[in-house]
Amino acid sequence: MIGTMRIGIGLPAAVPGADMARLGSFAAQAEQAGFESVGVIDRLVYDNLDPLIALAAAAACTSRIGLISTVVNVNWRANPRLLAKQISSVVRVSGGRFTAGLGMGGWPADYEASDIAPNGQGKRFAAALAVMDEAWRSPGERPSVVLGGLAPAAIARSAAPVSDGWVAPLFGFEVLQQGIAAARDAWARSGRAGLPRVITARYFSLGPQADAVADAYLEHYYGAEYFAPARSDTLTSAGGVRAELARLAGAGCTDVVLYPCSGDLDQVGRLSEAVGDAAVP
């Protein structure tokens, strides 16, 4: 930890070419290294694992480490009651370790593949959350929920009773700062005690050819339109990791998940060394 900010590492579940059969070993090494959580991201039309299945695999190979989604995209999953069941299943098999970051989903291809119109997503998301909230009435089934989104209405929604806070985007420090201020304001206006949980994430690549590995992965994942902003916040040196963690903690983040650009198991050890004592609870 840095101050009170918890440091997690992402699973390589969205890294094309990664050996997904070793995902459990990756999670076990992360737990042994002292990270607070393992995280997943979500897309449909891409070479990645379903995030909930990836987290269930991680849960089976660990006993203490937290599980975080940043985020599971709700709106192109047509049945929110089914999604609530899947999420509560991860809660139960993990012994309550799952923090469910939930969002609407922004990739047009995912909506096209799901035959769901991209308009009206705010209302769709709110309706789905209501269904899921009702489904999580039994003891031991409700996850800690944090809500993602960048629009003012989405950030305001993070103060809803179902939510424990806000999931910030993977890059953009100014956007993060503005979002934290807006989330805290919404929290106060809603009469919530204390401050919201704020979860953010960054990409990292460490070791030989770190920059080349990061370039190749981010170009493949984001394409030309979003490559530059994603790459600008990607961490490719130990000093860069430590400096960014200090900056995120100073901004008010409660959790950060660092996502690898490679599926190599050595990324766990390299990141642990880069973070140093801050990674040890």
At which residue positions do the language-model features occur?
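Active-site-adjacent structural elements that line small-molecule/cofactor binding pockets in enzymes
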Residues: M1-P281
